[in-house]
C-alpha cells in the first residue's frame, strides 16, 4: 500500500470497524498529536483512548475519505464522519440523531506507520443545522 492507501484504509476500515487491536500495525509508538505548532506524544495507547472516546459519543460512527492529497510524507485527507449521537459531547446532551461531520486529517507516514496526526472537524455547521447550538 502507498501512503494514501494506508491512511484511507486506516480510517475507512480500522477506525470505522472499531478494529482497535490492529492499531499497532498503523500507528507508531512514537506518534505525536499536532495541534498548531505544539506536539504531544500519544503513541498507540493515546490514539486508542481518542478513538474509544469518540465511540462513546458516536458508537456507530464511520469515516469516508472523499479526497486525499500527498506532500512529501504527509497525507491530507478530507472526510465525512457519520454516526448516531448517543453520548455527551462537550456538554451537548445526546440527541440520538445521525450526524454527519466534515473534517480534514493530516497524517505523516514514515515506514508504513502514522507518526504524526492532526486535523480539524467542522462541528459548527452540523450542530447549528440540528439546533444543538444557537446563534448569540
Range-by-range predicted roles:
Residues 1-136:
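C-terminal and inter-domain tail/linker signature
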